[in-house]
Amino acid sequence: MKVSVLITLAVLGVMFLLTSAEERGSDQMDSPAWLKSMEIIFQSEERECRWMFGGCTTDSDCCEHLGCRWEKPSWCAWDGTFRK
């Protein structure tokens, strides 16, 4: 839910910037710095651990008690441990 709200806000922000740039008659938008700051928000969401059957490249990509299976395509699976 949090991700969908952030995506919606990002889309609305980009639409606002596009329409305001058109109204000013400007061909150059001053939004690349703003878009790069939004990129950081989405990277923080993507850096969360991967759940069961999520794609992975190393064991550290997967959540606790999951490990990366190396079959193609790679995916997170239970590593046989239990929570204490």
From Swiss-Prot:
GO molecular function: ion channel inhibitor activity; toxin activity
Compartments where found: Secreted
Pfam families, per the entry: Toxin_12
Chief location of this protein within or outside the cell: secreted
Description of its domains: The presence of a 'disulfide through disulfide knot' structurally defines this protein as a knottin.
Entries under InterPro entries matching the protein: Huwentoxin-1 (IPR011696)
Domain of life: Eukaryota
Family as reported in the entry's similarity comment: Belongs to the neurotoxin 10 (Hwtx-1) family. 06 (F4b) subfamily.
Prodomain residues: 22-48
Intrachain S-S bonds: C49-C63, C56-C68, C62-C76
Protein function: Probable ion channel inhibitor.
Organism of origin: Chilobrachys guangxiensis
Any one GO CC term of the record: extracellular region
Tissue: Expressed by the venom gland.
Protein name as it appears in the record: U2-theraphotoxin-Cg1b 2
Signal sequence range: 1-21
Keywords carried by this UniProt record: Disulfide bond, Ion channel impairing toxin, Knottin, Secreted, Signal, Toxin
